[in-house]
């Protein structure tokens, strides 16, 4: 029998982008073939997708690490590297995705709903894509970016219309088994139910789902018993039904005190989805009271005695027996009406396949702040500057010059001057620190060797066919040198 796991910590790693290729086209009779290095392939994404055939997070419990494939490196002849394959992770309907700080990133409801858990790194550009009028034959390419790597918390919260709450052995599982075709484990000892059981109930034209939550005890909201682990499964329920054991022989227990104790736990529990689900806190949900085990004579008398007090609270009260099936028909109609009223008040949006992606910030923005650890130093923060640094081959002078041009065009140099940076000041971008030297406007060469130039392009004097034929005959000794060449 498979274990029910409803909370896991998942470490996801997207694929790394492939490096670009620095290559020059070589072909017979084409001395100036030009750059032909292809771009690197994009790394694969890690995607969570709701699958109707998955009902637990068990797979992630045993395999908590998920990594997508990397993109391939670009090649010559303008051949781009292959993209990495996306890794699709199947999750149950009702999975909530949280970050390390407990913030909700996505609430996955509906088969086919997707969430991009980790984005693959961009592939680096090859030198063919980097060529321009000023840089006709770049001798460098850009490196691929690393994929996003993060830890996520996955929590499964059952998607049900009605949640059954009650003390252990109150008969919740028995009630689900007679209302629906579900076959939960039933026995005469406490905490028989260790996992939520879902059942589908049909009443007239209304079909709804019922969730049997493991038994609650006082202190469940503080972690006593099993309640803290399973109270989350009530967060999506539109209607809460108290299932009360009227035949209990435990001292100090009666239907009124049981309901009061459970109400205190529901009021104390603050679910993460209460506001997002649009249902309010658990204490605000519609209630219905089910007095169970009326087939026992003493239980039937007790149910009749406490019914007026419970009805005075404004809650519908039903006396039933899950064993003899007494009172099930009116109970089913009442539950169906409560669910139908809720659906009418909260119309469901048109079903569609949703894809949830992280919000992309403004990539052009950056900031320059003083370095608190290095006097006179500065730290540059921003999406683009940090990405450009990660893409740069610092052992290639042309690549470093290209990075300087990009930073100048973005306005980083201007901002450093405004902040009072002196020549030679330490500047940190990402994980790279360097001594800053002011440059002239972007595109003007300050290095000894030109950035991205091909010396063959400076050969303006061409040798004609006659001269090449004469030189060939001289090499073979068929002719002598001209007097002016001697």
UniProtKB/Swiss-Prot annotation:
CDD domains: Obg (cd01898). Residues 160-340 form the OBG-type G domain. Mg(2+) binds at residues 173, 193. Its EC number is 3.6.5.-. Its cofactor is Mg(2+). InterPro entries: G_OBG, GTP-bd, GTP-bd_Obg/CgtA, GTP-bd_prot_GTP1/OBG_C_sf, GTP1-OBG_CS, GTP1_OBG_dom, GTP1_OBG_dom_sf, OBG_GTPase. It holds the Pfam family MMR_HSR1. One of its GO terms (biological process) is ribosome biogenesis. It is found in: Cytoplasm. One of its GO terms (cellular component) is cytoplasm. Keywords: Cytoplasm, GTP-binding, Hydrolase, Magnesium, Metal-binding, Nucleotide-binding. Residues 358-438 form the OCT domain. GTP binds at residues 166-173, 191-195, 212-215, 292-295, 321-323. Its main location: cytoplasm. One of its GO terms (molecular function) is magnesium ion binding. Residues 2-159 form the Obg domain. Residues 462-486 are annotated as: Disordered. Monomer. NCBIfam families: Obg_CgtA, Obg_CgtA_exten, PRK12296.1, PRK12297.1, PRK12299.1. Belongs to the TRAFAC class OBG-HflX-like GTPase superfamily. OBG GTPase family. An essential GTPase which binds GTP, GDP and possibly (p)ppGpp with moderate affinity, with high nucleotide exchange rates and a fairly low GTP hydrolysis rate. Plays a role in control of the cell cycle, stress response, ribosome biogenesis and in those bacteria that undergo differentiation, in morphogenesis control. This is GTPase Obg. It comes from Rhodococcus jostii (strain RHA1). The lineage of its organism: Bacteria, Bacillati, Actinomycetota, Actinomycetes, Mycobacteriales.
């Amino acid at each position: 029998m498979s274990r029910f796991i409803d909370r896991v910590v998942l470490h996801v790693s997207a694929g790394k982008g492939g490096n670009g290729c620095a290559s020059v086209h070589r072909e017979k009779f084409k001395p100036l073939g030009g750059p032909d290095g292809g771009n690197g392939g994009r790394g694969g994404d890690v995607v969570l997708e709701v699958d109707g055939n998955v009902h637990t997070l068990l797979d992630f419990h045993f395999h908590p690490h998920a990594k997508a494939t990397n993109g391939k490196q670009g090649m010559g002849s303008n051949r781009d590297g292959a993209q990495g394959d996306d890794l699709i992770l199947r999750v149950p309907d009702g999975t909530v995705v949280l970050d390390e700080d407990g913030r909700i990133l996505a609430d996955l409801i509906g088969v086919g709903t997707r969430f991009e858990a980790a984005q693959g790194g961009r592939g680096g550009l090859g030198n063919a894509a980097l060529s321009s009028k000023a840089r006709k034959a770049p001798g460098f390419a850009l490196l691929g970016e690393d994929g996003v790597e993060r830890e996520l918390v996955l929590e499964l919260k059952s998607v049900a219309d009605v949640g059954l709450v009650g003390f252990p052995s109150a008969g919740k599982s028995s009630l689900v088994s007679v209302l629906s075709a579900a076959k939960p484990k039933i026995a005469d000892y406490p905490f028989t139910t260790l996992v939520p059981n879902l059942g589908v109930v049909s009443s007239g034209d209304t079909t709804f789902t019922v969730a049997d939550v493991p038994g609650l005890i006082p202190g469940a909201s503080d972690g006593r018993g099993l309640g803290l682990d399973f109270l989350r499964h009530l967060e999506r329920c539109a209607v809460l039904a108290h299932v009360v054991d009227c035949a209990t022989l435990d001292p100090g227990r009666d239907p009124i005190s049981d309901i009061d104790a459970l109400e205190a736990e529901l009021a104390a529990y603050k679910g993460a989805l209460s506001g997002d689900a649009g249902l309010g806190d658990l204490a605000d949900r519609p209630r219905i009271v089910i007095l169970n085990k009326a087939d026992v004579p003493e239980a039937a008398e007790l149910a009749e005695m406490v019914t007026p007090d419970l009805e005075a609270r404004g809650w519908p009260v039903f006396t039933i027996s899950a064993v003899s099936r007494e009172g099930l028909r009116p109970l089913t109609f009442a539950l169906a009406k409560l669910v139908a009223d809720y659906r009418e008040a909260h119309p469901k949006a048109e079903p569609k396949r949703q894809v949830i992606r992280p919000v992309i910030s403004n990539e052009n923005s950056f900031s320059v702040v003083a370095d608190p650890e290095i006097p006179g130093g500065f730290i540059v923060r921003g999406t683009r500057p940090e990405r450009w640094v990660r893409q740069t081959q610092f052992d290639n002078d042309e690549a470093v010059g290209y990075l300087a041009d990009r930073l100048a065009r973005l306005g980083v140099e201007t901002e450093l001057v405004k902040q009072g940076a002196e020549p030679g000041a330490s500047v940190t971008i990402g994980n790279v620190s360097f001594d800053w030297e002011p440059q002239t406007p972007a595109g003007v060469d300050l290095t000894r060797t030109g950035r991205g130039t091909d010396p063959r392009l400076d050969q303006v004097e061409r040798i004609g066919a006659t001269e090449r034929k004469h030189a060939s005959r001289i090499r073979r000794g068929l002719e002598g040198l001209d007097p002016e060449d001697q």
